[in-house]
Every structure is written in structure tokens, then in C-alpha cells.
Swiss-Prot record:
Metal-binding in keyword set: no
Post-translational modification: The cysteine residues presumably exist in intramolecular disulfide bridges.
Enzyme class: oxidoreductase
Descriptive protein name: Luciferin 2-monooxygenase
Ranges of residues in domain VWFD: 80-266, 319-494
UniProt-recorded Gene Ontology molecular function terms: carboxy-lyase activity; Cypridina-luciferin 2-monooxygenase activity
GO cellular component terms given for this protein: extracellular matrix; extracellular space
Keyword Glycoprotein: yes
EC number: 1.13.12.6
Species the sequence originates in: Vargula hilgendorfii (Sea firefly)
Keywords: Decarboxylase, Disulfide bond, Glycoprotein, Luminescence, Lyase, Monooxygenase, Oxidoreductase, Photoprotein, Repeat, Signal
Signal peptide interval: 1-11
Length: 555
């Protein structure tokens, strides 16, 4: 059984060493380009031509990143992720990439509040090969120990075998384990505490991706999760301890591969390239494979191949659908539209394959527009209602206090006023601020199996279209800005989405975001603008963990 310990997370991704991320890119120009005024990308191309040329690091729309003498790009990802790759490369939460192959045991990540969980790696030298490879990952949570032996058919052992995994899902203490199928793979989903979950790939690769609710509460080789990329290898004790041994060269094995090894790996990986949905990774994995082949021969190269094939089969990022304002939708695949209508029980998102869950939204009339009245989340026979009036939370029709935990459902407050409802093994997360910000997250098991306003999660926005499931007749959107309103709306909204927001919140579709902001101002005046600014502040925090100041007009 191939194992992945999955994460339910949100986030922000920045490439730190661009030449490492794009090793086969042409040499950068000798002169430093002018810093572009816009970092937006459209259909894989940087809108501003000064934004570099590393097209394979952009998947459709997103952002391009430019640093002096470097040519890289970044995507609009919603995942804070740390990775250990089969070739011995590590990537921290903020994208610092390094190679580390020293035998021993190392803390990849741990909780710093109470020390109630940790993820430890065991690196070993096998059969006299060069360097070391990942052989075991150990997860300790509140007294329970889960050992995952890498590159084996039956890898999981709970508490030394004293607690066999006999059910699906299987729960022990704070940990839930469930096997979910995706095309070509069985995935084991393990979640604990506030959405700290790990992906253990079937070869010798690990990914850990915590929810932003854990900001400032994690340390280890992955980094301290302080939401500050400048902290990498400057403050964390686990990072500093390994620093003398990172990026060590091995005789005859350059990091970018020997030419003959590169050709071998191209032949090994090429048959899988045509069916890879994330083919931007091909060159990166080819060079990683070549390095691994030089270090440990065919066996180690095959683990890189397995890493590549699994990455190809999974979506590039976590599926995120957002409802914001009055009422704007961004689907899982980033189609965007707005509608007004006092619709009851509108299907926002659902598992339309196994019918295990759905998320529905009720709207109500408010003068000339509509807003959210209630969000209903169903998992099998369990129904959770989030009611705006009074911030009521009901499970099975009964009021519950927060935090709440029962079977595979947990509900808790994040950042004071964002309610998070997490459901496993479906890997469904719903975040709602009881106003006009609703975020739905799903993961790999539902790739191509969802329906509703959020669309079919398949990385194809062309098959996402507005469909209210016949629940109501749509009413026209209120008119936009008058000529008198427009100048002030433009001033406020351009200031809200200034250039600093690009880096802090990885803002995609900036012109569209400004238009939405202006719509809110022209709909409800200064109050509409300030409500929108606060919603954006929360959206930025949910997706990327960054905390923004609201405009002075709203303080």
C-alpha cells in the first residue's frame, strides 16, 4: 500500500534560490532588469516582460517573481509546505532549498506550544552508497507513536504494533487515519490537532503542510513558521545544527547531474511525461534523478521517478474555492464570477462521486443586494449549521460550544473570528467568518469528482460555470459605480491593493480584485469599502498566514 499522510492546509509559496529552482534556464542577462510594476501572470506568461522567462514555473495564472540576476516565477499557491525529496533535497516552509545527506535522526517539525507532537526523520547510509537516504519517518502525537518505514509495501506501525490499524477510518487519541483512493494510488490520510497533516510518499519523500492556525507554533528543519522567510537558517536551532553539513559536494556527482546520468534519467522519466498534469516539474526531476543515480545507482533513481509519478498524478495545489463580498465566487480552478439572488440551499460544493459531503449556502435579501444567511455542511448523516445571526453553531440541530470535536469532525476558532470546520477522512475544510467570507478547501481524493458553484476540481477552469442547481431565479446585479463615486472608489481600492500586497499576500488577478473593491464601495459607501478591506485581511491570513493593516479610513 502506498502511503501519503495528507495535509489540510493553506498557504503561500515563494522560491528562494531561483537558479536551483530553474537549473536548466539560460544564463541571466548581465544587466539587472528594471523592477517590474506588476508581477501578474496570465496563461503561463508574465504580463510585464521584465518579469523573467521561467515559464515552466508558472501554471496558468499567477505571479512572476523577479530578483536581481535571477529568472524565476511563483504561482498563486495556497499551501505552506515543507518537503524532503528522494534525491536528498529539502525545501523549508518558505522555499529555501538545500541538499542534506548526513546519516542520523533529525526533527523535521515539532510543536513549540507544549511539545505535544513531532515529526522525526531517520537518514541512513545503505550498502555503502554515497550520502544517506530517508528510511523512516516517525510521528509522535500526545503519547502515540506512528512509525512509517519508507519504500515498503506495508509501512505503518502504531505504538510498536500494539494498536493495529483495523478500521477505515481508524482513530487513536488525537490522530485519524483513513485510506482514500485516487486514480492509481491509495492515500492514507492522517490528521492531528489543528490540521497538521503530513504526506508520506511511497518512496523516500515526505511533505508536511500545516494550517496557518499554527503560525508561530512550529520549529524544526522545516522552519519556525513565523510567516517570515528571512528567519530560515537564522534562528531555528534544528536548522542551525545541520547548517555545516548542507549542500556538501560528493566526488563525481554534481548537483545538476553528469551528462550521461541526465540522459539516463530522461529515458527513465520520458514515458510518464505525456500523462503528467504537472509537466513543469520534468526538468527539475530529471536533474534530481541524475544526481540520485550518480549517488546510488538505479534503485535511488527509481525513488525519484516514483516521486515524479506521484507528483504528476496529484493536483499541483490544494483546491480552494472562495465566496467573498456581495457575492463573488472563485472556483477551485479559479474561474471567477458574481451573482445576486436570495437562493435557499444553493449547492456551493459537493462530492458528486461518493456523495460523502456537501456545502450549501443560504442567502437573504438586504435592500438591493443579497448576503449570506447560513452555511450548511453535511458529512454523511452529520449536519453542521453555521448561522450568521448570533454566530450560532449547530451540529445535528443542537447548539454546540467551540472548540468542538466528535468522531472525524473538529470545529475551532482561528484568529479570533474565523470558524474552521475540518472533516476527515474526506479532507474537507470550511472556514467562515460569519459575514461575507467563506472558504472551502479540498484535496487530492476529490480531483475531478466535485460539482456545485465551486466547479469540478480538475485544474480546468473552462468547465466551471455558474449553476445554481435550479434553486432560484437570479436577480440582476446592482448597478456599478456612478461617475461621482468612481474617483474615490479608484483611490481607495488602488491604495488597498498597492504593490506591497503582491509579496505579502501573493495577490492574483489584481485588476479583478480592484474592480470588486470598487463595487463594494459603490454599493454601500465607506462602510462597504471597509467591510471589504477587513474581508481581504482575513482572506490573506487564511490563505497565506500574513497579517495586514486595514486602511487608515477604516481604523
Amino acid at each position: 500500500m502506498k502511503i501519503i499522510i495528507l495535509s489540510v492546509i493553506l498557504a503561500y509559496c515563494v522560491t528562494d534560490n531561483c537558479q536551483d529552482a530553474c537549473p536548466v534556464e539560460a544564463e541571466p542577462p548581465s544587466s539587472t532588469p528594471t523592477v517590474p510594476t506588476s508581477c501578474e501572470a496570465k496563461e503561463g506568461e508574465c504580463i510585464d516582460t521584465r518579469c523573467a522567462t521561467c515559464k515552466r514555473d508558472i501554471l496558468s495564472d499567477g505571479l512572476c517573481e523577479n530578483k536581481p540576476g535571477k529568472t524565476c516565477c511563483r504561482m498563486c499557491q495556497y499551501v505552506i509546505e515543507c518537503r524532503v525529496e528522494a534525491a536528498g533535497y529539502f525545501r523549508t516552509f518558505y522555499g529555501k532549498r538545500f541538499n542534506f545527506q548526513e546519516p542520523g535522526k533529525y526533527v523535521l517539525a515539532r510543536g513549540t506550544k507544549g511539545g505535544d507532537w513531532s515529526v522525526t526523520l531517520t537518514m541512513e547510509n545503505l550498502d555503502g552508497q554515497k550520502g544517506a537516504v530517508l528510511t523512516k519517518t516517525t510521528l509522535e502525537v500526545a503519547g502515540d507513536v506512528i512509525d512509517i518505514t519508507q519504500a515498503t509495501a506495508d509501512p505503518i506501525t502504531v505504538n510498536g504494533g500494539a494498536d493495529p490499524v483495523i478500521a477505515n477510518p481508524f482513530t487513536i487519541g488525537e490522530v485519524t487515519i483513513a485510506v482514500v483512493e485516487i486514480p492509481g494510488f491509495n492515500i492514507t490520510v492522517i490528521e492531528f490537532f489543528k490540521l497538521i497533516v503530513i504526506d508520506i510518499l511511497g518512496g523516500r519523500s515526505v511533505r508536511i503542510a500545516p494550517d496557518t492556525a499554527n503560525k508561530g507554533l512550529i520549529s524544526g528543519i522545516c522552519g519556525n513558521l513565523e510567516m517570515n522567510d528571512a528567519d530560515d537558517f537564522t534562528t531555528d536551532a534544528d536548522q542551525l545544527a545541520i547548517q555545516p553539513n548542507i549542500n556538501k559536494e560528493f566526488d563525481g556527482c554534481p548537483f545538476y547531474g553528469n551528462p550521461s546520468d541526465i540522459e539516463y534519467c530522461k529515458g527513465l522519466m520520458e514515458p510518464y511525461r505525456a500523462v503528467c498534469r504537472n509537466n513543469i516539474n520534468f526538468y527539475y526531476y530529471t536533474l534530481s534523478c541524475a544526481f540520485a543515480y550518480c549517488m546510488g545507482g538505479e534503485e535511488r533513481a527509481k525513488h525519484v521517478l516514483f516521486d515524479y509519478v506521484e507528483t504528476c498524478a496529484a493536483p499541483e495545489t490544494r483546491g480552494t474555492c472562495v465566496l467573498s463580498g456581495h457575492t463573488f465566487y472563485d472556483t477551485f480552478d479559479k474561474a471567477r464570477y458574481q451573482f445576486q439572488g436570495p437562493c435557499k440551499e444553493i449547492l456551493m460544493a459537493a462530492d458528486c462521486y461518493w456523495n460523502t459531503w456537501d456545502v450549501k449556502v443560504s442567502h437573504r435579501d438586504v435592500e438591493s443586494y443579497t448576503e449570506v444567511e447560513k452555511v450548511t455542511i453535511r458529512k454523511q448523516s452529520t449536519v453542521v449549521d453555521l448561522i450568521v445571526d448570533g454566530k450560532q453553531v449547530k451540529v445535528g440541530g443542537v447548539d454546540v460550544s467551540i472548540p468542538y470535536s466528535s468522531e472525524n469532525t473538529s470545529i475551532y476558532w482561528q484568529d479570533g473570528d474565523i470558524l474552521t470546520t475540518a472533516i476527515l477522512p474526506e479532507a474537507l475544510v470550511v472556514k467562515f467568518n460569519f459575514k461575507q467570507l467563506l472558504v472551502v478547501h479540498i484535496r487530492d481524493p476529490f480531483d475531478g469528482k466535485t460539482c456545485g458553484i465551486c466547479g469540478n476540481y480538475n485544474q480546468d477552469s473552462t468547465d466551471d460555470f455558474f449553476d445554481a442547481e435550479g434553486a432560484c431565479a437570479l436577480t440582476p446585479n446592482p448597478p456599478g459605480c456612478t461617475e461621482e463615486q468612481k474617483p474615490e472608489a479608484e483611490r481607495l481600492c488602488n491604495n488597498l491593493f498597492d504593490s506591497s500586497i503582491d509579496e505579502k499576500c501573493n495577490v492574483c488577478y489584481k485588476p479583478d480584485r480592484i474592480a470588486r473593491c470598487m463595487y463594494e464601495y459603490c454599493l454601500r459607501g465607506q462602510q462597504g469599502f471597509c467591510d471589504h478591506a477587513w474581508e481581504f485581511k482575513k482572506e490573506c491570513y487564511i490563505k497565506h498566514g500574513d497579517t495586514l493593516e486595514v486602511p487608515p479610513e477604516c481604523q
